[in-house]
């Protein structure tokens, strides 16, 4: 396992397992006491994972693919399914937090860009006013020069 050589990776994986453990235990308890949840929510992902895992291992070993892969026993499938669902739950929370942070950053950036655009608009209006004043002053200067030329003649 490549991530096993990195201490930060080990800490991260250990943290995820520690966080997802109580939720997994709850799912296992629900699987034991509620057959509907066990049969339709917990066991199918575990059986699907088992099928993909066995087929991929056989494919990597270049062995013949069996027509039917034997299903996992109920306790093993319950444990595996509960672990998978608990880690998916933690992953979902993490993805939700990332989405929240990204949307918050996007909103903040959008607000800053809007403020910059407003400042640009105000500055453009000021420049237009100054340009109008300069043109008016230039016309007055030209009028005064013309008046001085007429007076000198």
From Swiss-Prot:
One example of a Gene Ontology biological process annotation: regulation of lipid metabolic process
GO CC annotation: mitochondrion
Pfam families assigned to the protein according to its UniProt record, in alphabetical order: OPA3
Coiled coil: 101-153
UniProt KW keywords: Coiled coil
UniProt-listed InterPro entries: OPA3-like
Keyword Coiled coil recorded: yes
Family: Belongs to the OPA3 family.
Protein name: Putative OPA3-like protein CG43998
């Amino acid at each position: 396992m490549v991530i096993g050589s990195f201490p930060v990776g080990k800490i991260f994986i250990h943290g995820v397992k520690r966080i997802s453990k109580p939720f997994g235990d709850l799912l296992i308890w629900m699987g034991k006491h509620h057959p509907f949840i066990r049969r339709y929510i917990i066991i199918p992902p575990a059986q699907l994972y088992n099928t993909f895992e066995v087929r991929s291992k056989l494919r990597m070993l270049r062995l013949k693919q069996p027509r039917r892969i034997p299903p996992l026993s109920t306790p093993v499938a319950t444990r595996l399914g509960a672990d998978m669902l608990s880690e998916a739950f933690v992953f979902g929370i993490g993805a939700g937090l990332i989405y929240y942070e990204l949307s918050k950053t996007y909103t903040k950036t959008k607000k800053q860009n809007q403020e910059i655009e407003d400042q640009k608009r105000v500055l453009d209006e000021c420049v237009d006013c100054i340009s109008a004043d300069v043109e008016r002053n230039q016309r007055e200067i030209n009028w005064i020069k013309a008046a001085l030329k007429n007076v000198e003649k």
